[in-house]
Amino acid sequence: VKRYIDVMAIHKLNTLHWHLTDEPGWRIEIKRYPELTAVGSRRGHTTDESRCLYPCYDGGYDPDAATVSNGYYSREDFIGLLRYAAERHIRVIPEIESPGHARAAIVSMKARYNKYKDTDVEKAAEYLLSEPEDTSRYASVQYYTDNVINVAMPSTYRFMEKVIQELAAMYREAGVPLATVHLGGAEVARGVWLGSPKCQALMKEKGMTKPHDLAEHFITQMADIMQRNGLKFSGWQEVALGHTEEAHRQLRTQAAGVYCWNTVPGYDEVVYQIANNGYPVILCNVGNFYMDMAYNGHPDERGLDWGGYVDESVSFSMLPFSIYRSLRTDGAGNPVDLDAAEKGKTVLTAEGRKNILGVQGQLFAETIRSFNGVEYLLFPKIMGLAERGWNAYPAWEELRGAQEQQAFNKALALY
């Protein structure tokens, strides 16, 4: 991590968004919940996940082995890394995934429940994130069927607040300011909560009519918890979509950043719609800035391809204020008619333009097994990210046709 922070500093990248939790692991020590690391940071052979998570990805069969499947950052590690980053003028934003992508936390708190249920039922259920009676049937994009926190249980909010408070305490000890915690919010599968008695009771009590109302309930509750602790919330684009106007009025004032990632054709208008709606936006365009996308379609290339292929020219071509013209080829590699790309699309308003805070690159680690893999997928792609972060108005943006192509080619050659 220190090597990566050094690389960021060299390229004048000023914010590290640290994805500390997800399905396959919980990677930060929280003293109040030792199960999060005793269970949630380890993967191996198990029949009940009482001492570790099931194996996934490469290896992960021995929960005690020193592999990429196992391990976490201790409290002392994290505090030291916060200071190291601050010395290099880099802000660290921690992410605690919720309510989806939360399987490691859910399994860990279930293990805690099972540890105490025969001796102290109240203590066992104090921080439980799942409802034993929930019969909901769903599958996430990654094919998990039990990765979403139950948003109707008071124990969920107790758990989240204590985690946030411990994170804030680490920042205080490090002498580093904390303004926001990223709450995730992405990719909650359809079908969640439909078989949960507690969720159905909450819907009836609050007059809710659709499952999304529960997601709205969660993010507004969490925004209030964050505010109570002197923080603003951040989240992926889903945290700002589909809400009532009442919820939008609340969330606009409590949001530090909405991270817009899904810019594949058909969804790319969402970015400017969110900015025009008054939310602060960070541009995370999958087609330009997902560093875990493969460089190309060669079978030996490591990386994913669901969002297209990303190389240094693709990251360089991103236009923050003309996102529809940010991809110069389609998924099949055919040239895009850039002059027609914006027709009929949502226009970024003057007020919306003020809400574009910056750009961010993502590197998810499903296909990575070592730091060499990190370096391979980041370089030289990351240079395009840095260029666009510091030069949001490249010379070719206002040009069209052959002039635009010539200006782009010249800038790319110099870059």
What positions do the PLM features span?
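A conserved hydrophobic secondary-structure block that centers on an alpha-helix together
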Residues: 1-23
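Aromatic/hydrophobic pocket-lining residues that form π-stacking "cages" and hydrophobic walls in ligand
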Residues: 4, 81, 92, 222, ...
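Anion (oxyanion) recognition and catalysis
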Residues: 9, 79, 86, 227, ...
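Short beta-strand segments at enzyme active-site cores
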Residues: 15-20, 92-96, 101, 178-182, ...
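Active-site-proximal loop/turn and secondary-structure-junction residues that shape catalytic pockets
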Residues: 20-24, 32, 96-102, 155, ...
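Aromatic- and acidic-residue-enriched carbohydrate-binding clefts of CAZyme catalytic domains
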Residues: 24-87, 102-152, 191-210
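Active-site groove signature of glycoside hydrolases
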Residues: 97-98, 134, 141, 145, ...
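Substrate-binding groove of N-acetylhexosamine-processing glycoside hydrolases
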Residues: 154-161, 165-181, 201-415
